[in-house]
């Protein structure tokens, strides 16, 4: 009976309790607000701050009621001090030098000010500051301030706004846009009562060159847990000075110079000292962590995108460089984190540093690409911080956002998250994406997918959740996710998928109770979530109120750890902006929901409420849940992190409430506690690979020879091997008994070799399973990115010069071609076999996919617009079921959105050119010139349009029949058929006027069957006309035009070419006027066909082709022996080089545009050029004047660091060794870079030859090419410092100016030039602005060499310039259009100055006519030429009147009254004349004297004329033996130089200038002998050593009839 009554009573009590729990609702209090605000709760209290507009409010009851803080009404933003979250807060005032501070949870506030004299530079200044507290001494404050100077006309408010924006923007980018702003750091030791500026000065250069400076400081003690033994007063700082020019976002290379220093103070900033180990390094960033100090240095002072090094100090005193698996260039400074054992996680930015800024006027270029977004890689270090590795599964080349998240109470647990957009187009992001998420519970050693364990909802998923490898949860993003202060209870938004596709619409809310290992569905929509009572109370608010099919807003709450949910309807419709727990430690029961009021307009659309009450604050209180019952031990369960496995040598146990317990923990303000159970025995998880080892694909630690080399371990090796432990214990792991790690024997044969002391050269090796078809670098300074395509039609990308190589994801589509944009060097296009077009605008960092028109790919090269990045032309075959189909024809398609869409532009178009974008002065900037193929007869015609061929009215036929056309420099050259199997060339500079290329008269009998355009770098066209086309006997005439391409002169008559039209012709890059050619000596034998072996000889010119000579040979060979032909003269003993026609890769030029004066070539010394395998390798460092032999045998070469590093590999043979030189070729060192010999194929580096990394490509010899091995050889550590580049202080830098002209004081292009060259060999050049390294020492006086025939004029036989028949002179008024400041022009004389000439004064042939006023500039013309009345009177009228009066007086008194002029011839000196006074006598004496002088001069001239005439006649008769009339011819060498400065010696008819020289007073006649002044070479070279030289490749574009 008693038992039954007890049971009944108990059941009633339980029933009532359950009923009460079911009826529970939280206490919700709503307050309204008129503006935007943010909420900041103090820890362990009910006090909350609200920053609303400019006011600060406070609540003492978890947000139920609010009151304004009196006296504070100018707040810009506020924050709780993270080091003292229970008491301290700051509020930044709109008045920049004022900050409000509280140390008692807002009860009282003090005003902190920085005295203006501390930060003002004498001008008006405003500043905005952020205060940082000392971790252990709250009275110590650092103020990081951004100071902006302004003048009286500027408003303080705008200045403050700029300073404030700098706090939230990257400061460097901000200050680049506004150099009037700077940052400063101040310190206070008395809680902000006064501040002192930290003064750290760097005086490396003149302050006038200082662009701006930055200062960043941090307390040495990072937190109360810091292991730093420095004193509390220690502060680290880095000061950076930027000199030079302001950053320009349109250019990737910044013309700035960085000077920085890393210092510390141990007395609150009174004195500073440099950290000696980092002295001389460019410190870019630093951060003090609890267990280590991290410093990042920049390698190149002239390139803010240069490689960086990471330095780690565990004792905060000595530093060790950390090994990075890739070049470190872009990082997210400030987001580097440290875990409990000292591992560092480092996100690396892959941003687009080349993006256009808003000032770019080209709308096409301003379209935003996805590549402007951040794409990151994640690196993680070992526990010692000295070796970083990639998280391999996160590597991808799609548009990817990567993130690693860890949480304080989940020891050893990491979440990895990526969002990829593989099909993202240029028009904006797509909602289609690939999500991938993984979890690791062992510090990242192993990773697994996020399992879905949710059998009751299994049917709601699109994949089989029982197979987590292909169906798992992928988190949308963990940015903004709360720091789960719970024992393993978590909620996220994500989508369940196979990892290949996801959509925002599929995103739902999921919950986990085991630390993120397994998950189940919570809501079928996205929510914002918050936790209370350490996870026992959960609140979730839908982002979209209609997501639950209910238009009214609501929140959901769970009191059983997410097992069940209860809905709470809100009275107002809101957009949730903020949901937080009022207790930051997660222990409380009250939440704040901040939402914007919204009005429904039907459906799922919402708009802002127009009323002022737009903001609501909801206080949600769960204090009464479960009738305030607190949990007891029986309500708890034990839960272990990572399933109870040892993490860092310990197990971590939480005593958490069971999900079904009807109670709350109610330990308000108690931090979440766990029990640490030390593991007895250590396991593999307590060890990591030793420094010299890395994990292979199976997880085994294997030796890495690069790391082995860096460690120096092999210094102790015996017999070439060393015994090492492959694993080491993780720092700070807590396990007690160590594992036994067996030593392994590691070979050291390739480490610490004599040729690689101190491990200064590092090598990385990668293998491909097939041969490489093509490989090419992007030509940028941002990084060393290149694309490689294999024989299997797969594309790979590397961003660090081949050290790390990743496959480009094309969804298994084969790639048939890679095309680079020649005008935008970071752009490339991959053409897929199935019509896919993969586009990168950021050097292969990311690719987007587009679709080509549904046509057959013809393989015709794309045509790009020179100024519009997204505009190009693609050629596709239409109606091409078969390439042999009669209907198959080409169509030119155009895109203006970067390949996103294409439109048909021109039917039968096979070759187009955006000519209007390439001409210097186009007649229409929108002009396109296209070649059309008539499939019916195979003929081609040339047409142009100015509106993409949209209308016939703007389409013009230029030539009815052409063979082809090409562009070179500023010219466009068209080849037309002429007669039988001949052609003619026409050139244009503007796309409208075409002029026929007039060849020298002696070529009139030669058929023009084939010519090759060789380039126009010097303003004239170099052209090769084939004069012999016998098989294996091809050669021809080398010609050069004037600057408008209308007339040519001959340079050399038998220059070698091959059957493909390539010519042995190479201009030396970077130097003016130096060209190398090979000529055929046995032309008669070759033309007759009696031999197929051409005897080639090499020649060089130093004046752009005017004079040629054989190349001087070295005195001795590389073995110190004399050549057998020595002493026989240059004709029998000169240097001969293998040229352009024999190259496997036309990019392998003799020279480099950045290594001035250096050339390397393969050749021989003798009478003729020998086969390559009988040759040696030579180099020169003075532009080709003198040469040295480097080694016997042929080698391939490459230049690095602008010639500071030279590398050679054997050409075409097996080897494992390279040669390198760092002293301009004076000494060479052998270095073994491979473990075994491989077939050498190529050596390459960046196009600018500025890097210190080289890529060597080797290949096996199987049928399909077998495997390919690429070696990335890094010389970056070979130099101890960067060269000092300071042209203003020549005595203190590492450069000097040198001349490469072998004839001193000789002028070319009107000047004498010098080039900058590095002096010392212990430094590297890097990105120093060597474009300024060319200087003109002297501008020469103008001579005939500096003029050429004007547009539509040609050089006649008499040497003068005459108008081409049928053409008219160019409109002289064009100068008025091209130069808005011009007010006058001259009529054309037929001559104009050569564009490259800088001559001054001297001969003037182009402006001898009288000036005429420009249209609309008559008044300005008159103003500059007229003389005013007074000046005219003084200068002309008055003197004229005086002279007239004197003349009349003399005539009247001395001539008229003595008989007049009729007696003039009769008067004798003694005759009587009228003399009445002294005046008459004086006048008569003047008349007598004038008469005597006139008579004497006239008589003398007659006698001399008669004598000279007779003498000359007699001499002529004696010499010629005949009599006849004689003619006087004006002759001078100066005038006989060619119309394009090359006539002398090339046109024997151009020697009569009589018709031209109608007024010889117009010219200076130079009578000096012009001789062969450009042939300075001696028969024997001197004994002194010489080094290398480099040059430019020619266009070598051929047109044949």
Swiss-Prot record:
It comes from the Eukaryota. GO terms for biological process: Golgi to endosome transport; Golgi to vacuole transport; protein targeting to vacuole. Residues 1452-1601 are cytoplasmic. Residues 352-369, 1577-1587 have a biased composition (Basic and acidic residues). It is a single-pass type I membrane protein. Keywords: Glycoprotein, Golgi apparatus, Membrane, Protein transport, Receptor, Repeat, Signal, Transmembrane, Transmembrane helix, Transport. Residues 21-1430 are lumenal. Residues 349-369, 1558-1601 are annotated as: Disordered. Residues 1-20 form the signal peptide. BNR repeats lie at residues 58-67, 100-110, 439-448, 510-520, 556-566, 796-806, 838-849, 893-903, 1178-1188, 1220-1228. It is found in: Golgi apparatus, trans-Golgi network membrane; Prevacuolar compartment membrane. The keyword Transmembrane applies. CDD domains: Sialidase_non-viral. Residues 1591-1601 have a biased composition (Polar residues). This is Vacuolar protein sorting/targeting protein 10. It comes from Vanderwaltozyma polyspora (strain ATCC 22028 / DSM 70294 / BCRC 21397 / CBS 2163 / NBRC 10782 / NRRL Y-8283 / UCD 57-17) (Kluyveromyces polysporus). The lineage of its organism: Eukaryota, Fungi, Dikarya, Ascomycota, Saccharomycotina.
């Amino acid at each position: 009976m008693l038992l039954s009554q007890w049971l009944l009573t108990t059941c009633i009590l339980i029933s009532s309790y359950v009923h009460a729990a079911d009826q529970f609702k939280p206490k919700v209090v709503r307050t309204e607000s008129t503006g935007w605000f943010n909420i900041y709760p103090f820890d362990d209290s009910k006090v909350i701050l609200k920053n609303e507009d400019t006011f600060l409010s406070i609540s003492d009851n978890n947000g139920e009621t609010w009151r304004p803080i009196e006296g504070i009404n100018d707040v810009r933003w506020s924050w709780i001090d993270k080091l003292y979250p229970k008491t301290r807060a700051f509020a930044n005032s709109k008045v920049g030098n004022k900050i409000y501070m509280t140390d008692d949870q807002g009860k009282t506030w003090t005003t902190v000010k920085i005295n203006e004299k501390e930060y003002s530079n004498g001008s008006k200044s405003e500043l905005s500051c952020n205060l940082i507290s000392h971790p252990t001494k709250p009275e110590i404050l650092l103020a990081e301030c951004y100071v902006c100077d302004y003048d009286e006309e500027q408003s303080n408010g705008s200045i403050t706004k700029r300073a404030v924006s700098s706090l939230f923007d990257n400061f460097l980018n901000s200050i680049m846009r506004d150099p009037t702003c700077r940052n400063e750091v101040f310190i206070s030791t008395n809680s902000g009562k006064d501040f002192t500026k930290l003064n750290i000065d760097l005086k490396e250069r003149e302050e006038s060159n200082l662009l701006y400076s930055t200062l960043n400081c941090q307390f040495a003690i990072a937190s109360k847990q810091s292991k730093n033994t420095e004193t509390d007063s220690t502060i680290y700082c880095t000061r950076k000075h930027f000199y030079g020019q302001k950053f320009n976002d349109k250019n990737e290379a910044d013309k700035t110079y960085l000077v920085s220093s890393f210092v510390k103070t141990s007395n609150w900033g009174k004195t500073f000292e440099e950290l000696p180990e980092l002295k001389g390094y460019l410190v870019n960033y630093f951060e003090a962590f609890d267990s280590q100090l991290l410093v990042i240095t920049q390698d190149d002072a002239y390139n803010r995108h240069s490689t960086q090094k990471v330095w780690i100090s565990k004792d905060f005193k000595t530093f060790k460089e950390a090994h990075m698996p890739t070049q470190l260039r872009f990082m997210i400074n400030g987001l580097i984190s440290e875990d409990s054992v000292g591992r560092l996680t480092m996100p690396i930015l892959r941003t687009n540093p080349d993006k256009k800024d808003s000032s770019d006027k080209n709308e096409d270029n301003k379209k935003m690409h996805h590549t402007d977004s951040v794409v990151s890689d994640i690196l993680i270090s070992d526990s010692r911080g000295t070796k970083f590795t990639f998280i391999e599964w996160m590597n991808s080349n799609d548009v990817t956002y990567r993130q690693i998240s860890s949480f304080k109470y989940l020891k050893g647990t990491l979440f990895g998250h990526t969002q990829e957009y593989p099909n993202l187009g240029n028009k904006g992001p797509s909602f289609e994406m690939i999500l991938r998420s993984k979890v690791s519970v062992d510090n990242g050693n192993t990773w697994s997918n996020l399992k879905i364990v949710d059998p009751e909802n299994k049917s709601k998923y699109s994949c089989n959740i029982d197979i987590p490898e292909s169906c798992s949860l992928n988190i949308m993003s963990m940015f903004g996710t709360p720091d789960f202060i719970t024992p393993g209870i978590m909620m996220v938004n994500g989508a369940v998928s196979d990892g290949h596709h996801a959509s925002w619409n599929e995103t739902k809310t999921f919950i986990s109770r085991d630390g993120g290992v397994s998950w189940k569905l919570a809501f079928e929509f996205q929510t914002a979530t918050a936790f209370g009572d350490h996870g026992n109370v959960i609140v979730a608010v839908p982002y979209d109120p209609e997501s639950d099919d209910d238009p009214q807003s609501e929140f959901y709450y769970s009191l059983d750890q997410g097992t069940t949910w209860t809905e709470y309807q809100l009275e107002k419709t809101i957009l949730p902006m903020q949901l937080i727990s009022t207790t930051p430690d997660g222990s409380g029961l009250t939440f704040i929901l901040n939402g914007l009021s919204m009005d429904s307009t039907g459906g799922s659309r919402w708009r802002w409420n127009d009323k002022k009450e737009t903001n609501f604050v909801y206080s949600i209180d769960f204090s009464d849940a479960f009738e305030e019952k607190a949990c007891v031990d029986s309500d708890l369960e034990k839960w272990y992190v990572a399933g109870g496995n040892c993490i860092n040598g310990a197990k971590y146990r939480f005593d958490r409430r069971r999900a079904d317990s009807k109670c709350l923990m109610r330990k308000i303000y108690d931090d979440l506690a766990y029990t640490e159970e030390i593991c007895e025995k250590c396991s593999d998880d307590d060890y990591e690979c030793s420094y010299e080892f890395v994990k292979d694909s199976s997880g085994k630690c294997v030796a890495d020879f690069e790391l082995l080399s860096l460690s120096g371990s092999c210094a102790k090796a015996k017999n070439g091997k060393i015994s090492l432990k492959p694993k080491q214990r993780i720092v700070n792991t807590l396990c007690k008994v160590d594992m036994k790690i067996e030593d392994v024997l590691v070979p050291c044969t390739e480490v610490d070799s004599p040729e690689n002391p101190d491990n200064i050269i590092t090598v990385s090796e990668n293998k491909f399973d097939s041969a490489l078809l093509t490989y090419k670098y992007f030509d940028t300074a941002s990084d060393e990115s290149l694309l490689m395509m294999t024989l299997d039609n797969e594309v790979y990308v590397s961003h660090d010069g081949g050290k790390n190589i990743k496959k480009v994801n094309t969804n298994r589509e084969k790639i048939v071609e890679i095309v680079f944009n020649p005008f935008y060097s970071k752009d490339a296009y991959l053409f897929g076999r199935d019509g896919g077009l993969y586009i990168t605008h950021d050097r292969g960092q990311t690719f987007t996919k587009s679709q080509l028109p549904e046509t057959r790919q013809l393989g015709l090269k794309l045509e790009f617009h020179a100024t519009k990045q997204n505009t190009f032309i693609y050629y596709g075959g239409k109606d091409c079921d078969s390439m042999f189909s009669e209907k198959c024809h080409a169509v030119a398609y155009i895109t203006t959105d970067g390949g996103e869409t294409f439109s048909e532009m021109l039917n039968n178009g096979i070759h187009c050119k955006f000519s209007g974008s390439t001409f210097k002065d186009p007649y229409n900037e929108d002009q396109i010139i296209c070649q059309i193929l008539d499939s019916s007869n195979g003929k081609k015609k040339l047409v142009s349009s100015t509106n993409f061929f949209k209308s016939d009215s703007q389409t013009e036929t230029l030539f009815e029949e052409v063979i082809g056309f090409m562009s070179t420099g500023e010219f466009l050259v068209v080849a037309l058929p002429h007669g039988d199997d001949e052609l003619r060339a026409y050139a244009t500079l503007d796309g409208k006027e075409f002029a026929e290329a007039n060849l020298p008269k002696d070529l009139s009998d030669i058929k023009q069957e084939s010519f090759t355009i060789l380039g126009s770098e010097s303003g004239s066209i170099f052209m090769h006309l084939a004069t012999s086309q016998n098989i294996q006997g091809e050669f021809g005439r080398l010609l050069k035009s004037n600057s408008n391409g209308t007339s040519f002169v001959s340079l050399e008559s038998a220059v070698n070419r091959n059957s493909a039209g390539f010519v042995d012709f190479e201009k030396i890059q970077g130097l003016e006027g130096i060209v190398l050619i090979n000529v055929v000596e046995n032309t008669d034998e070759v033309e007759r066909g009696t031999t197929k072996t051409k005897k080639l000889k090499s020649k060089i010119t130093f004046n752009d082709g005017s004079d040629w000579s054989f190349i001087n040979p070295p005195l001795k060979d590389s073995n110190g022996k004399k050549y057998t032909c020595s002493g026989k003269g240059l004709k029998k003993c000169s240097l001969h080089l293998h040229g352009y026609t024999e190259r496997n890769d036309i990019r392998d030029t003799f020279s480099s545009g950045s290594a001035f004066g250096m050339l390397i070539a393969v050749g021989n010394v003798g009478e003729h050029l020998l086969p390559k395998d009988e040759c040696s390798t030579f180099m020169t460092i003075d532009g080709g004047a003198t040469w040295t032999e480097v080694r016997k045998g042929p080698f391939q070469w490459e230049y690095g660091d602008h010639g500071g590093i030279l590398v050679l590999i054997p050409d075409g043979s097996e080897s494992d060794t390279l040669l390198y030189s760092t002293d301009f070729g004076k000494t060479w060192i052998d270095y073994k870079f491979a473990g075994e010999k491989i077939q050498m194929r190529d050596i390459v580096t960046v196009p600018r030859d500025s890097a210190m990394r080289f890529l060597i490509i080797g290949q096996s010899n199987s049928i399909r090419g077998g495997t390919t091995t690429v070696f990335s050889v890094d010389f970056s550590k070979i130099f101890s410092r960067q060269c000092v580049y300071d042209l203003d202080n020549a005595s203190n830098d590492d450069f000097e100016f040198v001349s490469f002209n072998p004839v001193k004081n000789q002028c070319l292009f009107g000047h004498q030039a010098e080039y900058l060259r590095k002096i010392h060999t212990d430094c590297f050049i890097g990105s120093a602005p060597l474009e300024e390294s060319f200087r003109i020492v002297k501008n020469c006086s103008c001579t005939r060499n500096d003029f050429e025939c004007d547009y539509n004029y040609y050089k006649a036989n008499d040497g003068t310039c005459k108008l081409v028949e049928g053409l008219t002179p160019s409109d002289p008024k064009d100068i008025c259009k091209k130069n808005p400041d011009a007010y006058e022009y001259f009529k054309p004389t037929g001559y104009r100055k050569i564009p490259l000439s800088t001559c001054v004064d001297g001969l003037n042939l182009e402006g001898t006519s009288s000036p005429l006023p420009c249209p609309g500039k008559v008044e300005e013309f008159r103003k500059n030429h007229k003389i005013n009345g007074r000046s005219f009177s003084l200068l002309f009228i008055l003197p004229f009147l005086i002279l007239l009066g004197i003349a009349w007086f003399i005539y009247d008194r001395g001539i008229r009254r003595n008989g007049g002029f009729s007696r003039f011839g009769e008067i004798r000196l003694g005759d009587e004349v009228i003399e009445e006074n002294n005046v008459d006598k004086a006048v008569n004496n003047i008349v007598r004297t004038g008469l005597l002088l006139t008579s004497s001069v006239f008589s003398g001239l007659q006698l001399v004329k008669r004598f000279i005439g007779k003498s000359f006649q007699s001499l002529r008769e004696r010499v010629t033996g005949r009599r006849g009339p004689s003619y006087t011819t004006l002759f001078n060498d100066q005038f006989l130089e060619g119309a394009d400065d090359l006539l002398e010696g090339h046109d024997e008819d151009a020697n009569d200038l009589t018709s031209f020289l109608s007024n010889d007073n117009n010219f200076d006649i130079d009578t000096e002998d012009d001789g062969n002044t450009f042939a300075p070479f001696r028969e024997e070279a001197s004994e002194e050593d010489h080094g290398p030289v480099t040059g430019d490749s020619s266009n070598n574009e051929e047109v044949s009839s």
